[in-house]
Regions:
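Short, Gly/Pro- and small/polar-rich lid/capping loops
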Residues: 56-97
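Adenosine-phosphate binding glycine-rich loop
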Residues: 59-60, 256-257, 362, 366-476
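Glycine-rich, N-terminal phosphate-binding loop and its surrounding beta-alpha-beta segment
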Residues: 96-168
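Glycine/serine-rich phosphate-binding loop and adjoining beta1-alpha1 elements at the start
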Residues: 131, 150-265
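Glycine-rich phosphate/diphosphate-binding loop of Rossmann-like nucleotide-binding domains
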Residues: 240-243, 247-340
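Rossmann-like adenosine-cofactor binding region
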Residues: 301-391
Length: 476
């Protein structure tokens, strides 16, 4: 096992910095809590410090949208300024410089983050993303969304997120493994089953989680499978985890349609994005909702057929050819064209910002389901609402993944293995309960589902904060 860097702790819960000079597979780590001021190490380059933003700085786009939505939902609640302040800032942020050896003996330098937003209801929980455009602002925004997501589902968890700015498509499998292990070596002091539990996210998967849990257990010298979820089943991963986000989102869609008195059976769905979530949504859509899938796309190509796209034919073509180009199951459309095709529901399973102020007026779907994080901008979402298009927000629509991750934690803690049937039944029950609670909140306050979901989450988090004495108010 590679030698770990010597860590210098400066003030309890404030700053953690590495005192070693850089070398292959080592790192610099800076951990900051609340508004603690970082103390620069002489070995730390100024570029690293220049790239760090204080938590209290003016938020940029992604985080600003989340905070604006939270402040909008506050009007439905009795929340003090202090309580809102706690909700609006990260509890802890860790930024690390990761130095990873290339296959040719040279070295990459990456920057990784772990943002731990709020743990009033339980340990921090959130995925790890590998992406070229990953930023600290994006990681913060997604950590705040995870705080809301776990609370909407009433899970005993908080919210966090991690990310590394890299292009995994340019890395070999051994290089991705070394990067994954380096990230855990940098972050392990702030991770653990009772502290912060990562999971897969964009461009990370069960294989990556397997490397990460192995590295964590090697450092700690004991088995700790509950440290990371989304692992391979042989390492304690839960059955049903790969399809959990899609299954959860379809269950929510089906429940909302029933609440509206508009069953989906026989109607049409368009799925924008065909990664893990989108492909599983295509596979499961008819069984869960009774609807037919009429459109699919990846980042470069798409298909549309108003009569329906058979999953087996389309997925097999995609797997063989890497895109939908030339697939005879439907007419070729671009990803942009697919967004504006008519459908009973449009499932957004690709990236952030797919619907914004420029294209929201062209959307023809009756409902939009956010299976990705922040796929609808604040302006785009408002225009959809103004046009009477119902939006199922990401903190409800894609919460199936974290729910089954929680099931995985429960199984790991008790050394049990649930059947897939048990996982699916429990997931559908949890998603139905959360959907009913959000719809009830929306009806009681005459508001949209996003505002209702955020308000419900904030209400539950603030109750936990008050019970902990984190405000001048008390729940007693």
């Amino acid at each position: 096992m590679p030698m770990l860097p010597t860590l210098l702790y400066v003030d309890h819960w404030s700053t953690l910095i590495s005192t070693n000079m850089p070398r292959p597979n080592s790192h610099f780590t800076v951990t900051r809590d609340f508004d603690a001021t970082p103390i620069a190490s002489p070995a730390m380059s100024q570029d690293v410090w220049d790239g760090m933003e204080p938590t209290g700085s003016e938020p940029s786009s992604h985080l600003a949208e989340v905070l604006n939505q939270m402040h909008g939902a506050r009007s439905l609640l009795d929340v003090s300024d202090l309580e809102m302040e706690v909700l609006s800032h990260a509890r802890r942020e860790t930024t690390a410089q990761l130095i990873v050896q290339r296959d040719d003996g040279d070295h990459f330098v990456f920057v990784g983050h772990r943002v731990q937003w709020n743990d009033a209801r339980g340990p921090f929980k959130g995925g790890i993303r590998f992406h070229p455009a990953e930023t600290l602002d994006m990681t913060r925004a997604l950590a705040a969304l995870m705080m809301l997501k776990t609370a909407v589902l009433d899970l005993p968890l908080g919210g966090g997120k991690g990310g590394v700015q890299c292009d995994p498509a340019t890395l070999s499998r051994p290089e991705r493994e070394r990067l994954s292990r380096s990230y855990i070596r940098a972050m392990h002091p702030v991770l653990g089953p009772e502290l912060d539990i990562p999971a897969p996210d964009m461009n990370t998967n069960a294989e990556v989680m397997g490397w990460m849990v192995d590295e964590f257990e090697s450092i700690r010298g004991r088995h700790a499978p509950g440290t990371i979820t989304g692992k391979p089943p042989v390492l304690g991963g839960s059955r049903g985890r790969p399809e959990a986000t899609a299954l959860g989102g379809l269950s929510v869609l089906h429940r909302v349609a029933d609440h509206m008195g508009k069953p989906l059976a026989g109607n049409s769905l368009v799925i924008h994005g065909y990664g893990n979530v989108g492909s599983h949504a295509h596979q499961l859509a008819t069984d869960i909702t009774g609807a037919r899938v009429t459109g699919v796309c990846d980042s470069r190509s798409g298909l549309f057929n108003p009569e329906g796209l058979p999953y087996e034919e389309v997925s097999a073509w995609k797997q063989r050819h890497g895109s939908f180009v030339g697939c005879p199951a439907g007419s070729a459309v671009s990803p942009e064209e697919l967004l504006v095709q008519p459908a009973s529901a449009l499932l957004l399973a690709s990236m952030e910002g797919m619907i914004d102020g420029h294209n929201a007026d062209d959307i023809q779907a009756e409902m939009v389901v956010e299976l990705a994080n922040q796929p609808t901008s604040q302006e785009g979402g408002q225009r959809l609402l103004d046009r009477g298009i119902l939006v199922i927000p990401d903190i409800l629509g894609n919460a199936g993944g974290v729910t089954v991750s929680y099931f995985e934690q429960v199984q790991n803690a008790s050394w049990q293995r649930w059947s897939r049937t048990q996982v699916v039944e429990q997931l559908q029950q949890e998603m139905a309960s959360a959907t009913d609670a959000v719809v009830d909140m929306a009806h009681r306050h005459d508001t949209d589902l996003r505002t209702a979901a955020i308000a419900l989450a904030m209400e539950r988090i603030v109750e936990a904060q008050r019970s902990r004495g984190w405000s001048s108010r008390s729940s007693m």
